[in-house]
Curated annotation (Swiss-Prot):
Ca(2+) 2 binds at residues 198, 251, 254, 259. The keyword Membrane does not apply. The lineage of its organism: Eukaryota, Viridiplantae, Streptophyta, Embryophyta, Tracheophyta. Its cofactor is heme b; Ca(2+). This is Peroxidase 11. Pfam families: peroxidase. It is found in: Secreted. Belongs to the peroxidase family. Classical plant (class III) peroxidase subfamily. GO terms for cellular component: extracellular region. One of its GO terms (molecular function) is lactoperoxidase activity. It comes from Arabidopsis thaliana. Glycans are attached at residue 246. It is an enzyme of class 1 (oxidoreductase).
Length: 336
């Protein structure tokens, strides 16, 4: 036990990052009324469009939240994830954690075009994505939180950081904790933010090793788990390359409702993604196991922490973009 505690402690001491981000907790140049005089309708416009988009397909809520997450973990929340590849810029869209999982770029384009028609050159793509993620959460039953705004869009992207900074579905707990910690996010933040998987879907390529690996061990193969596992294997064949892009809900109980069901799934040992299940069954999950149990028992506690953690993640800013950033006219390209 002492060895486990030592390893867990070392995660929090060795992996201290050296980056130029303004991490959560510092004085930040973001305010709730940043657009009060320059684009007072921006929140209403984004809300209205998100209502239509989520009504068209509830999965769009998870898509926008995921885009926001992947943006903030690379260079801070600066809209870099939205940049297309050009002759002079290598974008993040083709990085391994993004290429087969991120969508929603056309949704951002749609909202941005409307905002530009009302308030040209005022609202950043980074702010659009941050507000949209909040509204997406609410529209599928999740909590409300105030969104501070005033972010700038970066003129750069980082394929390398997208490859190294973002957690992957098959990653172990210690590595994931380190990645959140490097962004200034705590273990409590991590467990809460991963709760957004309650409305997400995953591709076969991202859960194949789990359902043909230790799923039987963690779920103890009770009759319900056996049935669930059999259905997953029908969706996702064992052979790599076969059915890789087939998808299923990460939360198979209430897949279109933002609730705490995902944590009950982990308690049963039925987590679809290894990275999720690790929070409850890993030998190093002393703290995460307790938090998962708390959120499974108390949905109010989960909602409260999720709101706080989303604000905290949204406050990860890129110092370079703050000083030399811009408001892109088209979220896919740097202004010329």
């Amino acid at each position: 036990m002492m060895r486990l505690l030592f390893v867990f402690f070392m995660v929090h001491t060795i992996f201290i990052p050296c980056f130029s981000f303004d991490t959560p907790g510092k004085d930040l140049p973001l305010t709730l009324d940043y657009y009060k005089s320059t684009c007072p309708t921006v929140f209403d416009v984004i809300k209205k469009e998100m209502e239509c988009i989520v009504k068209e397909d509830p999965r769009n809520a998870a898509i926008i939240i995921r885009l926001h997450f992947h943006d903030c973990f690379v260079q801070g929340c600066d809209g870099s994830v939205l940049l297309d590849e050009t002759e002079t810029l290598q974008g993040e869209k083709k990085a391994s954690p993004n290429i087969n999982s991120l969508k929603g770029y056309k949704i951002v384009d749609r909202i941005k075009n409307i905002i530009e028609s009302e308030c040209p050159g005022v609202v950043s793509c980074a702010d659009l994505l941050t507000i949209g993620a909040r509204d997406a959460t609410i529209l599928v039953g999740g909590p409300y939180w105030d969104v501070p705004v005033g972010r700038k869009d970066s003129k750069t992207a980082s394929y390398e950081l997208a490859t190294t900074n973002l957690p992957t579905p098959e990653e172990g707990l210690i590595s994931i904790i380190a990645k959140f910690y490097s962004q200034g996010l705590s273990v409590e933040d991590m467990v809460a933010l991963i709760g957004a998987h309650t409305i997400g879907k995953a591709q076969c390529r991202n859960f194949r090793s789990r359902i043909y690996g230790d799923f039987q061990v963690t779920s103890a193969l009770n009759p319900v788990s056996e049935t669930y596992l059999a259905s997953l294997r029908e969706i996702c064949p064992a052979s790599s390359g076969e059915g890789d892009s087939n998808v299923t809900a990460i939360d198979n109980v209430t897949p279109n409702l933002f609730d705490n069901s995902i944590y009950h799934t982990l308690l049963r040992g039925e987590g679809l993604l290894n990275s999720d299940q690790e929070m409850y069954t890993s030998l190093f999950g002393i703290q995460t196991r307790r938090i998962v149990s708390k959120y499974a028992e108390d949905p109010v506690a989960f909602f409260e922490q999720f709101s706080k953690s989303m604000v905290k993640m949204g406050n990860i800013l890129n110092s370079e973009s703050l000083a030399d950033g811009e408001v892109r006219r088209n979220c896919r390209f740097v202004n010329t």
